[in-house]
């Protein structure tokens, strides 16, 4: 976020704090009943923030940027609904429809909030933002398979598993199946498709106003490329960008 002006950067940090607070509920090892209670409390908290019940710094900061950038309450509630899908174990070999809905809620809604903060919120930029959000979320899924296994999650959609002859919903058996790497390759093509669609829409958008989003896109394109090079036969090798790769992408973001 170094290429954002200070106020916009601080707004993004406030959104990040909200997302982190939301994710921490789903990713904890607490009982499901406790997670559901906390999610209910978070939904109430968002309603109270919009009703100016601001009794702590988190609420005050978030409300300041909600008002400044006219952020729609629906997007925050959509993010919470996405986390609920994890808590309720819906995201184990989901249908294509559920998978797409999940990607919108946990990534697309964040992208639309970001566009409001960037000051570039129109039909074209929203289309770009949603394509990009899908691509980023799918890349995250393909990167975090090992970690998601430990949380009892398997995000690869059922239709892709079926296409590769994987009929079980048991995560350990899915990962052991010799066709699982092919299923991951199939999902990576869906990420590529969304990146390509984002690139097409970007041609008719203001690149100057979307610098941060473009930098994120370039970063994740490279990450996906490295994931495909490693493959999914073994999940032991962690895939990350080197400091040089990050620096190069940052320089590219400044001059684009």
Predicted regions and their residues:
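Catalytic cores of Mg2+-dependent Asp-rich isoprenoid enzymes
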Residues: 1-137, 142, 146-256
């Amino acid at each position: 976020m170094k290429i954002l002006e200070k106020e916009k950067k601080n707004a993004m940090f406030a959104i990040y704090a909200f997302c982190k607070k939301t994710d921490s509920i789903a990713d904890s090892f607490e009982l499901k009943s406790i997670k559901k209670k906390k999610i209910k409390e978070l939904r109430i908290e968002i309603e109270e923030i919009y009703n100016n019940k601001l009794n702590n710094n988190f609420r005050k900061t978030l409300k300041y940027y909600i008002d400044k950038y006219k952020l729609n309450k629906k997007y925050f509630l959509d993010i919470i609904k996405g986390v609920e899908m994890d808590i309720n174990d819906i995201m184990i070999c989901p249908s294509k429809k559920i998978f797409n809905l999940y990607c919108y809620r946990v990534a697309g809604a964040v992208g639309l909030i970001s566009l409001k903060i960037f000051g570039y919120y129109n039909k074209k930029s929203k289309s770009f933002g949603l394509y990009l959000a899908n691509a980023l979320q799918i890349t995250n899924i393909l990167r975090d398979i090992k970690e998601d296994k430990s949380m009892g999650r398997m995000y690869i959609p059922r239709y892709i598993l079926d296409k590769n002859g994987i009929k079980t919903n048991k995560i350990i058996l899915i990962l052991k199946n010799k066709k699982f790497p092919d299923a991951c390759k199939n999902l990576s093509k869906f990420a590529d498709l969304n990146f390509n669609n984002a690139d097409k829409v970007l041609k008719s958008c203001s690149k100057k106003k979307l610098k941060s989003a473009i930098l994120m896109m370039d970063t994740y394109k490279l990450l996906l490329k490295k994931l495909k090079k490693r493959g999914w036969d073994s999940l032991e090798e962690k895939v990350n960008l080197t400091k040089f790769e990050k620096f190069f992408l940052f320089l590219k973001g400044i001059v684009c």
